Amino acid sequence: MNMQDAYFGSAAELDAVNEMLAAIGESPVTTLDEDGSADVANARRILNRINRQIQSKGWAFNINESATLTPDVSTGLIPFRPAYLSILGGQYVNRGGWVYDKSTGTDTFSGPITVTLITLQDYDEMPECFRQWIVTKASRQFNSRFFGAEDVENSLAQEEMEARMACNEYEMDFGQYNMLDGDAYVQGLIGR
């Protein structure tokens, strides 16, 4: 299983790719076999990049404010898993595939650490508004890079704006925001 398949189930990814193809007036496909179509390969690549880009901002559905990361008992190393998009706060970073503590200058830990973690969620586990935003933004970039149809661009830009607004509404409803100290994302920025 490759990395992109881990976050898009084949049926969900096929649906998303077909939405992208439909946006540019192409016929749907029945398989994600990239050998048969450059359009499918390009659509998948853009879709997965946009998915990571949007999720990496950190949202109520993919921020874990008290994730416990446990080191390997023999090496003391904590792997920085592919699903980890970032650790907020600035103290811990990904260095060579391992969690690295910048304040102590080491990647070896004697015990578990608790962090605020942004993780890449499976497509099917995301709120609908985020799925729509990802597919619409990916469709727009797909059109822009490979076809350049201006009328399609304008239509997709409007749809993307509406999808993003729906995501912002979702975030206001489900995020834990307050005037005094903000959310986990704001705390991460403050800690930099």
Curated annotation (Swiss-Prot):
- Whether Hydrolase counts among this entry's keywords is yes
Going by the UniProt record, its keywords in alphabetical order are: Degradation of host capsule during virus entry, Degradation of host cell envelope components during virus entry, Glycosidase, Host-virus interaction, Hydrolase, Viral attachment to host adhesion receptor, Viral attachment to host cell, Virion, Virus entry into host cell
Its EC number(s):
3.2.1.-
One cellular-component annotation, GO:
virion component
- What processes in GO biological process is this protein linked to? adhesion receptor-mediated virion attachment to host cell; symbiont entry into host cell via disruption of host cell envelope; symbiont entry into host cell via disruption of host cell glycocalyx
Field pH dependence? Optimum pH is 5.5-6.0.
Describe the subunit structure: Homotetramer.
Provide the family line. Answer: Belongs to the tail tubular protein gp11 family.
What's this protein's name?
Tail tubular protein A
* Gene this chain is encoded by: 31
